[in-house]
């Protein structure tokens, strides 16, 4: 009885660990397809109020330029005193 119980528990542990390993391998195949921009860089841009501008999007480029110049102004004013 004890031996069959131990074998059943061992079988369950091995089957769950092998399925978890298989799922991990599948996740690694998906990762290269994720966005090229790192999460950290993206969150910093959002924090600073800067957005990604597509090619030829003049309005977006103006907004980004104003945001960057405003941040530069704040930074230089802080260091003058």
UniProtKB/Swiss-Prot annotation:
Signal peptide: 1-20
InterPro entries: Phytosulfokine
GO cellular component terms given for this protein: extracellular region
Subcellular location: Secreted
One of the GO BP terms on file: cell population proliferation
One Pfam family this sequence matches: PSK
Highest taxon of source: Eukaryota
Post-translational modification: Sulfation is important for activity and for the binding to a putative membrane receptor. PSK-beta is an enzymatic derivative of PSK-alpha.
Protein name according to UniProt: Putative phytosulfokines 6
């Amino acid at each position: 009885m004890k031996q069959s119980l131990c074998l059943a528990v061992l079988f369950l542990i091995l089957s769950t660990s092998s399925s978890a390993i298989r799922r991990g391998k599948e996740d690694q195949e998906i990762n290269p397809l994720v966005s090229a921009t790192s999460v950290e860089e993206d969150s910093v841009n959002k924090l600073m109020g800067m957005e990604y501008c597509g090619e030829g999007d003049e309005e977006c480029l103006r907004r980004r330029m104003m945001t960057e110049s405003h941040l530069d102004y704040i930074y230089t004013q802080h260091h003058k005193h």
